[in-house]
């Protein structure tokens, strides 16, 4: 920063001195045209004329002054002035100094060189570390005092913590392992969906072991200049050796560790040179150096096999989505700084958030706190957590959207059809909440909440899901006729078709085709294994697959139609409840399915609008 200020200060001083050299002493005098000057000479009003090139500084007999400019060379001017007895003073031409002459001739070139150096420094190093330092590592080093994260801050992944806990013991006491001939894994690859806490777990390892922590993203290695990535890899490992024992953490390593020869661009590019250098460095340092490389990715399938072999990343730690107990622990960690009402139960929230990652749960707590802050509450209650969960699962409410009475009615029938089918088909998740308030891009939403974490899905459950997906379209068809069915079921049809196709081609749920895999490979061009899309079936087999998919859809479509026809009274009653209350939960759904009077939702107040 100081060097940049000095650089621009020098340029400013030089420019000011150059401009000052060309200034005249009489720039502030009043200017008059040349014809007026000649007229006043003829009228004998001029006392003195100071001639400096083509500029004349004039002093009149009344002591007033002005300047004028000779537009063309006038040979009679001096004679006229002498005739009128005007005092003539000629300016002595000033020769510029040698320094000014050299500066004027070289200044443009020096300015261009200075600007080039400045911009190269800013673009490449972002802070004045030198214009030729492109190959320096961008890894940021955090000392043991800067890392406050510990295993207590990481929840919901007990198995992963147990896997990496021996790293902490090794970094604290390496001789304990070395004297028995044991070697700690040189590299650990953390694999898991986004938001599961891979980066947080790596920081906790460094925080527990109290060792330096180098962090860098996979995309920071590759630049526009050839060879920069490999140079940065060398520089990073060189610095880490000086700080050993230490941890190097590479986030999103698939940006640089993608399989070589991938895509259409050939096999020799800057990214592959960087990967080759990383492979050499990982295999080059000995285990007793105390350098542990940890990387994180959610795309392990695209990584180069050489990167995953023993001796490099020889251990994979799966950081999966948390189960119900893990979600409860994560919620408790994030609720530490939030004032909570007595009715808040983390276990109930955890039970209602299957499939949520650690990042999702952190966002849930934050959204609940924001809801409470908007209402000027002092504590966050269970109601705010419920509203935050609905927002994350079903989208934000769009109450400003104007819907006609017919649109509300058709949406209510559509959502009621989903709910009724979902409640009456076997092995289906129970309906948790249904609303006709527009949320996100949907006019209405039906949300089914699993009773437990889903590990595998049975054929019966898949067929029940297909029937439920068509429940909305069938409800419209039964009430309004086939010609008046809307396009609102587009996404339902898309999901149902995909499920049926997977059941036939991937999961072996077709009696005619048997338990064989018929799925075509997708995304191969990005992995570099094939440019053309491979086809693993004959035309006749493809025709049979289409027939089986259609048959599966027709069976479940017909089942859903029969269920709605047999429960048409519940369909009408649920439509009325949705129009009145706009949102109903599992308790109201139970009342409707048992043909009882529907209780009012909690906190609902009847107004003239919803009458």
Swiss-Prot record:
Give the cofactor note text.
Binds 1 zinc ion per subunit.
Alphabetical list of InterPro entries matching this protein? AAA+_ATPase, AAA_lid_3, ATPase_AAA_core, ATPase_AAA_CS, FtsH, P-loop_NTPase, Pept_M41_FtsH_extracell, Peptidase_M41
Q: Name one Pfam family in it.
A: Peptidase_M41
Indicate the residues that form the catalytic site.
415
Checking SMART domains in the record gives: AAA
Q: Which residues bind Zn(2+)?
A: 414, 418, 492
Localized where? Cell membrane
| Gene Ontology molecular function terms on file | ATP binding; ATP hydrolysis activity; ATP-dependent peptidase activity; metalloendopeptidase activity; zinc ion binding
Q: Does the keyword Transmembrane helix apply?
A: yes
Give the UniProt entry's GO cellular component terms.
plasma membrane
Q: Which HAMAP family match?
A: FtsH (MF_01458)
Q: What is this protein called?
A: ATP-dependent zinc metalloprotease FtsH
Q: Please report the organism this UniProt entry assigns to the protein.
A: Buchnera aphidicola subsp. Acyrthosiphon pisum (strain APS)
């Amino acid at each position: 920063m100081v060097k940049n200020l000095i650089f621009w200060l020098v340029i400013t001083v030089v420019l000011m001195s150059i401009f000052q050299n060309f200034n005249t002493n009489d720039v502030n005098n009043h200017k008059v045209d040349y014809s007026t000057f000649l007229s006043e000479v003829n009228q004998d009003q001029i006392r003195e004329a100071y001639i400096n090139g083509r500029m004349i500084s004039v002093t009149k007999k009344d002591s007033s002054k002005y300047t004028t400019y000779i537009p063309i060379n006038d040979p009679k001017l001096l004679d006229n002035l002498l005739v009128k007895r005007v005092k003539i003073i000629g300016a002595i031409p000033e020769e510029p100094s040698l320094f000014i002459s050299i500066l004027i001739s070289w200044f443009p070139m020096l300015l261009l060189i200075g600007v080039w150096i400045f911009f190269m420094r800013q673009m490449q190093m972002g802070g004045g570390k030198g214009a030729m330092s492109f190959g320096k590592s961008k890894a940021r080093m955090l000392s043991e005092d800067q890392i406050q994260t510990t295993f207590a801050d990481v929840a919901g992944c007990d198995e992963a913590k147990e896997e990496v806990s021996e790293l902490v013991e090794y970094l604290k006491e390496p001789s304990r392992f070395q004297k028995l001939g044991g070697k700690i894994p040189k590299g650990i690859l953390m694999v898991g969906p986004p938001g599961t806490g891979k980066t947080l777990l790596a920081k906790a390892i460094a925080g527990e072991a109290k060792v330096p922590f180098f962090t860098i993203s996979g995309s920071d290695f590759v630049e526009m200049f050839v060879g920069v990535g490999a140079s940065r890899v060398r520089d990073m490992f060189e610095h880490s050796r000086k700080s050993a024992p230490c941890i190097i953490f590479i986030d999103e390593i698939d940006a640089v560790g993608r399989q070589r020869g991938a895509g259409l661009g050939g096999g020799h590019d800057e990214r592959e040179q960087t990967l080759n250098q990383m492979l050499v460095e990982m295999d080059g340092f000995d285990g007793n150096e105390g350098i542990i490389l940890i990387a994180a990715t959610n795309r392990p399938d695209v990584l180069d096999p050489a990167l995953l072999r023993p001796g490099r990343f020889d251990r994979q730690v799966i950081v999966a989505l948390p189960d119900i107990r893990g979600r409860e622990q994560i919620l408790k960690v994030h609720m530490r700084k939030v004032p909570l009402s007595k009715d808040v139960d983390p276990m109930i929230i955890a039970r209602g958030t299957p499939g949520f990652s650690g990042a999702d749960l952190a966002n849930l707590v934050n959204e609940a706190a924001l809801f409470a802050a908007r209402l000027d509450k002092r504590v966050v209650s269970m109601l705010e957590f419920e509203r935050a969960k609905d927002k994350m699962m079903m989208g934000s409410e769009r109450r400003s959207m104007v819907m006609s009475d017919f649109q509300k009615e058709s949406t209510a029938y559509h959502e009621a059809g989903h709910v009724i089918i979902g409640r009456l088909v076997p092995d289906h998740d129970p309906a948790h909440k249904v609303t006709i308030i527009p949320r996100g891009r949907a006019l209405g939403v039906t949300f089914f909440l699993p009773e437990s974490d889903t590990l595998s899905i049975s054929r019966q459950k898949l067929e029940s899901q297909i029937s439920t997906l068509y429940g909305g379209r069938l409800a419209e068809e039964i009430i309004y006729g086939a010609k008046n069915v809307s396009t609102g079921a587009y996404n339902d049809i898309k999901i149902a078709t995909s499920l049926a196709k997977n059941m036939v081609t991937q999961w072996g749920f077709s009696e005619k085709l048997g338990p064989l895999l018929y799925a075509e490979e997708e995304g191969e061009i990005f992995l570099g294994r094939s440019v053309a899309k491979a086809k693993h079936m004959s035309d006749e087999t493809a025709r049979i697959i289409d027939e089986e998919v259609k048959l599966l859809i027709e069976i479940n479509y017909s089942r859903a139609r029969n269920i709605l026809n047999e429960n048409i009274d519940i369909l009408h009653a649920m439509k009325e409840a949705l129009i009145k209350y706009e949102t109903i939960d599992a308790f109201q759904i139970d009342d409707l399915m048992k043909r009882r009077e529907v209780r009012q939702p909690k906190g609902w107040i009847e107004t003239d609008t919803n009458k």
